[in-house]
């Protein structure tokens, strides 16, 4: 990908997702006319955040850096309280903006801060991880973790723009690329099988941040999410398909005290959801096994602790998709044919979990 590509997210109001390299100039244009901008960044991105601050300052914008903790440790209420305090101290107003710089966790907490400060100000996401690029930055879902569960406190708040700078992927460790691939695989199974074909053709090429395959996978995954979000901005029905594999994944993350990477948990969750669909008579054997084969080829986990099901069941009952104590899962009725499974029998859940239980 040599020239920037723009994917329009047709929400109300709409916003662009710009995919390319060297997008600092685009950030300046997106924020043109703002008086103050707060740049929320994770510790390892201080140098990049300072470059953004300098660039915006040269354009006459009063820009400030706010450092937040890395990963899921940053998605907590005390961190949001700290952000609010700094926003108040530097005088960020309703016509100003926040820039989020970092992975999915930074995007989530910065988005929540933007949604709640002065009842909502603009935010521009600059995701620096693969997971952030294809999942957290697009769609307007924000949230923090509490003792009650992952992302149960949050808001819908669409960004003003998303800038995906592909050059940032080249400095990421391989395990970060691998983890982000789980959400791309999910997009392939629920809506765009070409994604799966591309990965199967050459898994190593799919993981190469300097090659041509990964940028196209990112673009396709963003298009899938953009189309679903535009059709169902507030997750009333269709958007639930984006939670394919996530019911078990969130339970695993909670059991692991958020020390597992989100992509790793989603990978196990995808295989579980596929097995659940198969055992319910809704998904064929070949597509079920294809989940396991593709995820394994990318180096993602497809099994979890055999004795964990009771704890995971307790967490899943607290999942935001649960209604009146009835568990609801996204399953497939075929490739790119997502559906819903409500209130499955506990024996069916146990049988599906047995297929991902680690020996």
UniProtKB/Swiss-Prot annotation:
Cofactor annotation comment: Binds 1 divalent metal cation per subunit. Can use either Co(2+) or Zn(2+).
Any GO MF annotation of the entry: metal ion binding
CDD domains recorded: DHQS
GO biological process: amino acid biosynthetic process; aromatic amino acid family biosynthetic process; chorismate biosynthetic process
InterPro entries: Dehydroquinate_synthase, DHQ_synth_AroB, DHQ_synth_fam, DHQS/DOIS_N, DHQS_C
Uppermost EC category: lyase
Organism listed in the record: Mycolicibacterium gilvum (strain PYR-GCK)
GO cellular component: cytoplasm
Name of the protein described by the UniProt record: 3-dehydroquinate synthase
Entry-linked HAMAP family: DHQ_synthase
